[in-house]
Structures are given as C-alpha cells and as structure tokens.
C-alpha cells in the first residue's frame, strides 16, 4: 500500500492549532439537562475565544453526534449559528459511531488538502442524559391517522385500538440494528474468544483510572478541558467526574458481570460508562496558521478506516485500521512515541492488543506476512483512557487527538497512533506528528 500524503497540492501539511473539550460527565449528573447541541456550542465558543481568532475566518464546521436529536439533526450548522461565526460558514454533520470525531477531522483535513478551505473546525458532542425518547410503531401510526380524522367518533375508534403497552415510551436502541447484539455482548464474546480473564480486564481498568487521576493531579489535562457552566448557571464542572481518583484494584472484583451473569467477565467497572460531553479541534493549512501567528500543536500524518463483520469480533476495528495507517505514514509500530487506543471495554482493548502481536491474525485476516508487533505498554494510553475519562460517543476522537498532541509536545515531539473501534464493525486509525 502506498504512502499517504496529507498535504495540499502545493505541499503544505494539515495542521492542528487548537483542541478543547468540556469535562466529561456521567449520565444524569452535572450535564443531566444539557442537550448535545448546547455542549457543542459551549466547547466551540470557548475554543475560538482561547485561540483569539476572528470567528468569521472559520470556513467550515464538521461536527458529529451519535445519539441524534430530531429537533436539531444538523448539529454542525446549529453550532455555526449559535457561536458568532459567519452565516455563510459551511457546516454539515457526520456520524461514524465511536469514531465520529475522527471522521469529522478527516473531512476537514480533506477539504484543506483539496484547497476548498484554509480553516475548519471538527469535533463531536453527545448526551446520554437528554435522549430522543420515541413511541411504539403502532402509536406513531395511530397518531398520524388521528391527525386525518374529522369526527370525535373516528378519533375514539382509533384510540380504542391501542393497548397500554402501545403507549409506553421507547428508549433509543443499544443493540446493533442488523444483529440485535449490544456492544457489551460483543465485548463478552471477545473476552471468551481470546481468553481474556476478568483479572486482566480489571487490571487494565485500574491502570486507566490510576493514570488518568495522576494526569489530572499533575495538571497535564487542565488546559485542554474548559470549565463548563450549564444552564441554569447555578453550578459548574471543571473536571471529569467518572475518574476514580483513589482507584484500588481489589474493589473491581466486587462487581458482578453485566452481560453474562453466570459465566461473564465484563462488568460496569471494566467498561466505559454512558457519558455526556463535547470536544473540538481547529485545523488549518500549515501556511495559514503561520500567517496568523498561531502555534501549531501538530499535524495529521496519515489516517485509515476499516470495516469488518458484526456477528463476531465487531470491536476489532483497530487491528484492521492500524496497519493501513502505519503503511500510509511510511512507518512501523516501533517508530511510534505514543499509542492511544479507545477503551470501550477492557476486553476489547486487550483483544486488539493481542491481535496487534499475532502473526496468525495478520496472515489469516489481513493478508500480511507478519504482525505489526507487540505494543510497548510504556507507550500505551499513558494518561489513561476512555475507561476512566468516559465516552461521549462522538467526542472521544477529538479528546484523544488533543490529549495525544499535548503529550507528544511534552515529550519533545514524535509520532503517535490514535485508534478506535466503533459500532457496525468499524475501525479508525490516525497517525499524528509533532515536531
């Protein structure tokens, strides 16, 4: 596979000049009444203020939301209209499940590469608290028919056909539409298929919380997380509220399995919680960033997406996308300074790490002569991961990009991998570079 050039036709690189996120909050806590669109506006507004850039210079916004709200289907355009940008700023929304803001970043990068724009914003927001609660199909059909009736008798006849069950609200589905399998069930299957023990999963979760707590304590995360003042402005949140600041390994063993009560090993403690939050990054043509006198955080070196089956191993996307991104960057796993993998579940993370190092997997599934290699854990998720920070679906990619670039900078530069699994058997990988 050939090397990928993430550059404009004149040879300029795609630079990331800013990155910011809200604190991530567990479902029904501080952001319990804040819709995703407001979280998105909040973070983009603050990022532009910190960058001190004229909002009218932003030419494109690509934003994502996984849990869609019918009243605001194009979250990107709502963000443009609600943050002081020019009304002529192009804006559209994307969704790639848990890899949504990676897709948003790539879309903006490709617009810059094509010469269509110089400056764009990418990101994502999700609320697991403010949800689109639906109605049954029978009630929906009856309500539609009701609007066309003319007499009271006709209305009563329609309503009399409804049962109590038909009137019950329908929450958003948590299972795959095509298979009926939930993410947790797939994580449980992967734990069993790849012989990943409960102890290994709990140890990874403990590691994630411990490293995230340490990162916050040492001030490494502070500047990339804004203080949020959600309506009605009576309280604020300036830190992620899912992190166990005093994580103890023995406490993880106390939880019961969540998806296979009898033989399972996936628990609430070694899985990401439902989370509310938003994150955004600002991308520019390299020359434009220098012209404006902005400090460049880093560059996108390459990216790749992959799609696999959903009946089994649905969360193995990183193992398929990462080799492609490495090839396109012209590097190997050993060339990386940092590796950051989205931790949807400890089981999924550990299964992917095993497949990174498996020659059998590489030969049989990827058609490669050998594995990309074993991950050096001293480079892996060094500030903790999604198990600790939480996972507002569409925001996680932008969180990872910002967090990784800042950590690379602290280490004097280098190359890093960001990779994530996603619903529908999707995978994303991105190589980032800091000079």
UniProtKB/Swiss-Prot annotation:
Major localization listed first in the record, in broad terms: cytoplasm
Keywords: Acyltransferase, Cytoplasm, Fatty acid metabolism, Lipid degradation, Lipid metabolism, Transferase
Pathways per UniProt: Lipid metabolism; fatty acid beta-oxidation
GO molecular function: acetyl-CoA C-acyltransferase activity
Annotated family: Belongs to the thiolase-like superfamily. Thiolase family.
Top EC group: transferase
SUPFAM superfamilies named in the record: Thiolase-like (SSF53901)
Full protein name: 3-ketoacyl-CoA thiolase
EC numbers: 2.3.1.16
Description of how the protein assembles with itself and partners: Heterotetramer of two alpha chains (FadJ) and two beta chains (FadI).
Gene3D superfamilies in the record: 3.40.47.10
Alphabetized NCBIfam families for the sequence: AcCoA-C-Actrans (TIGR01930), FadI (TIGR02446), PRK08963.1 (NF006516)
Gene Ontology biological-process annotations: fatty acid beta-oxidation
Cellular localization per UniProt: Cytoplasm
Gene that specifies this protein: fadI
Superkingdom to which the source organism belongs: Bacteria
Function: Catalyzes the final step of fatty acid oxidation in which acetyl-CoA is released and the CoA ester of a fatty acid two carbons shorter is formed.
Pfam family, one: Thiolase_N
Catalysis performed (reactions): an acyl-CoA + acetyl-CoA = a 3-oxoacyl-CoA + CoA
InterPro entries to which the protein is assigned, alphabetical: Ac-CoA_C-AcTrfase_FadI, Thiolase, Thiolase-like, Thiolase_C, Thiolase_CS, Thiolase_N
């Amino acid at each position: 596979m050939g090397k990928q050039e993430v550059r404009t036709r004149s040879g300029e690189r795609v630079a990331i000049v800013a990155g910011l996120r809200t604190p991530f909050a567990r479902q029904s806590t501080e952001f319990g009444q804040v819709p995703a669109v407001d979280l998105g506006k909040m973070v983009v507004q603050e990022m532009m203020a910190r960058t001190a850039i004229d909002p009218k210079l932003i030419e494109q916004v690509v934003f994502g939301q996984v849990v869609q709200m019918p009243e605001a289907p194009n979250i990107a355009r709502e963000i443009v209209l609600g943050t002081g940008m020019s009304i002529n700023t192009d804006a559209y929304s994307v969704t790639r499940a848990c890899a949504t803001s990676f897709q948003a970043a790539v879309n903006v990068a490709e617009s810059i590469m094509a010469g269509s724009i110089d400056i764009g914003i990418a990101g994502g927001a999700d609320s697991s608290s403010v949800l689109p609660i639906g109605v049954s199909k029978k009630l929906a059909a009856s309500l539609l028919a009701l609007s066309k009736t003319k007499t009271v008798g006709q209305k009563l006849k329609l309503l009399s056909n409804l049962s109590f069950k038909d009137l019950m609200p329908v929450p958003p589905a948590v299972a795959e539409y095509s298979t009926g399998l939930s993410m947790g069930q797939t994580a449980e299957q992967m734990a069993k298929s790849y012989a990943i023990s409960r102890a290994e999963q709990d140890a990874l979760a403990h590691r994630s919380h411990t490293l995230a707590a340490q990162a916050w304590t040492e001030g490494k995360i502070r500047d990339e997380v804004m203080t949020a003042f959600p309506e009605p402005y009576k309280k604020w949140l300036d830190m992620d509220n899912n992190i166990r600041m005093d994580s103890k390994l023995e406490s993880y063993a106390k939880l019961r399995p969540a998806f296979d009560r009898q033989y399972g090993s996936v628990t609430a403690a070694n899985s990401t919680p439902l989370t509310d939050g938003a994150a955004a990054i600002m991308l520019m043509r390299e020359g434009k960033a220098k012209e404006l006198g902005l400090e460049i955080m880093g560059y996108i070196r390459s990216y790749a997406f992959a799609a696999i089956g959903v009946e089994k191993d649905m969360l193995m996307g990183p193992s398929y996308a990462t080799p492609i991104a490495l090839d396109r960057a012209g590097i190997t796993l050993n060339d990386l300074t940092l590796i950051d993998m989205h931790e949807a579940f400890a089981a999924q993370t550990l299964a992917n790490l095993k497949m990174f190092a498996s020659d059998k997997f590489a030969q049989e599934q990827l058609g490669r002569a050998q594995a990309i290699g074993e991950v050096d854990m001293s480079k892996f998720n060094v500030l903790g991961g999604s198990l600790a920070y939480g996972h507002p679906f569409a925001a996680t990619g932008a969180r990872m990009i910002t967090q990784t670039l800042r950590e690379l900078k602290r280490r004097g530069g280098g190359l890093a991998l960001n990779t994530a699994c996603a619903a529908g058997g999707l995978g994303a990988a991105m190589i980032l570079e800091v000079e």
